[in-house]
Amino acid sequence: MLDSFTILTKGGIVLWSKEFAKIKGSPINSLIKKVLLEERSAETSFQIDSYSLKWTFSNEFDLIFVVVYQKIFTLLYIEELLTTVKKRFIKMYKDLLLKLKESSDFIIVDKFQEFNFEVILEDVENRSKLQQTSNSAPKKYEDTDKGKLVKDQKNERAIKEGRVEKVKRKEQEKKEKAERRKQNKANNINDISSDDDSDDSDSSSGSDSEENSNGATKNQQTDVARIENSGYKKKVKDTPDKQASSSTGKKARTWEDGKLSKKELEALNRSDNSNGTEIVREKIQKFNIDMDVSSSDDDDEEEAKPVSGFMKYFNVLTGNRVIDKQDLEPILADFKLHLTKKNVAPDVADKIVQSIGTGLEGKKLATFQGVTSVVKQQMEDTITRILTPKRNIDILREVQAVKGKRPYSIVFSGVNGVGKSTNLAKVCYWLTANGYKCMLAACDTFRSGAIEQLKTHADRLNVHLFERGYSKDAASVAQDAIAFAKDTGYDVVLIDTTGRMQNNEPLMKALSKLVNQNNVDLVLFVGEALVGNDGVDQLTKFDKSLSLLANTTQTHIRTIDGIILTKFDTIDDKVGAAISMVYSTGHPILFLGTGQNYTDLKRMNIKSVVKSLLH
């Protein structure tokens, strides 16, 4: 049933391996690259091609035990096999493993070939078969699916009958209340009529026929007085003079399908010669794009101070020589809560915490090694590995590589209102300051005012804006813009796109068409640093939609290449969105938006983000 079983060190040295069938490709290398190096070791299984892989760690000796089998099979004994092999292997070669851990030069792989794996496998398989046969005893009728169904139907019938009785009782109570209300009303009417009869008998008949000067009776006068006292007033129609005075302040309605006046046309004019407005040009100059980060000496000072902040939770482990699962559980629960407070998405926080726990469990401490320092280092290493980009994107170097041959094209995508146009202008300023000739392409042909907004940036930065107006095909506009840039000698084309929700299929299909049809060099997702779960959902769905909705015959389908996080200056130390987005997709964060000026664009400093997250 198994295809292979491998025992290797965390450094990549294979100590023992056994193949039961020919393996296609390198599933273990894929596991290391896509799971272990990306801090996803908390996951229980990994599938690639036709294989399913499961693994376990021995942190005390820095070992990994990996089993590979066909994913079409459901093998119930895999977990037990991994645990048993780990215990037997460590018990059998403990001294060798200690020497290997102390010195990487001490490698005697031949010594491990004596390990008798087949005996352990046969023993585990037999125990699994016995357990399955014992579990296959006849079930009681109540435990079968049919018995459960009958039981559920009986319960539902009883609930319905109870509800019917309850409804009947309520209806009966309503009828009784209505009867009582009628009876009370009839009694009140009888009392009033008897009072009226007594009043009529006391009054003379002549008084009933008396009239006032207008011919109205006294009773009618009383009715009029009662109405006036009640506050009711008959609406009096305004006089023509009053209507004229009130209509002077009202503006005429402007109908959308009517003709525009000359004044209205002038108000809508956005051309350069409108009202002779002077354009304020930005002074382009180089600026420091790297984040400010405190000196490394501060870390040494912090070590001398008493432990505070989140790391105080680890004081409870002081004195333990080996970290076990029971020690870690309450601490990791607190750390998960700490991460969510820092705006890390809950599911991402859970996976990170599990990965940290997996890396710490069973770790043996040196004689004078503090638990706090070990745990802190493990956390820093884990989060640093998550944020470290797997693909190094150097925009300046890539632009320089194609300069003179063709323009380098960058697409800015994202949902509505995150600051795509603003950050496009910031990147344009940065590239222009580094000596490259840039052009803006207005491919947001959907939102009213988008072209005018981009034109404002183009005028201030003194760069050319390529536009074809509204209601045009964005992919065709981008294609024409890139062709125009090539003919006129531009180095970079920055393409602005329509803001769209991640579940809007027509707009996502249009974005996929733009990206894949024009074979752009870089696709950036612009997201807010303020969001947690929403940002992850937006990014993952944008990423999937670009590939799934692509209508192209190209073998290489384009997806998101990098991330720009905006409004980073508003979140203080709640930097969790950066962790969530990078962990969920593996895409690097290229820039951080830190303000409203063109120079408020920074590269992310991983050390600074880790420090904010852990304190």
UniProtKB/Swiss-Prot annotation:
* GO BP terms, alphabetized: intracellular protein transport; protein targeting to ER; SRP-dependent cotranslational protein targeting to membrane
Composition-biased stretches (Acidic residues): 193-202
Subcellular localization is given as: Endoplasmic reticulum membrane
Q: Where is the composition biased (Basic and acidic residues)?
A: 139-181
Membrane protein topology class: Peripheral membrane protein
- In residue numbers, the region (NG domain) covers 408-614
Top-rank lineage group of the source organism = Eukaryota
Q: Where does GTP bind?
A: 414-421, 496-500, 566-569
Pfam families listed in its UniProt record: SRP-alpha_N (PF04086), SRP54 (PF00448), SRP54_N (PF02881)
Recorded GO terms, molecular function?
ATP hydrolysis activity; GTP binding; GTPase activity; signal recognition particle binding
Chief location of this protein within or outside the cell: endoplasmic reticulum
**Described purpose of this protein according to its UniProt entry:** Component of the SRP (signal recognition particle) receptor (SR). Ensures, in conjunction with the signal recognition particle, the correct targeting of the nascent secretory proteins to the endoplasmic reticulum membrane system. Forms a guanosine 5'-triphosphate (GTP)-dependent complex with the SRP subunit srp54. SRP receptor compaction and GTPase rearrangement drive SRP-mediated cotranslational protein translocation into the ER.
- Which family, according to UniProt? Belongs to the GTP-binding SRP family.
The subunit structure is: Heterodimer of an alpha and a beta chain.
Query: What protein name applies here?
Result: Signal recognition particle receptor subunit alpha
The organism is Dictyostelium discoideum (Social amoeba)
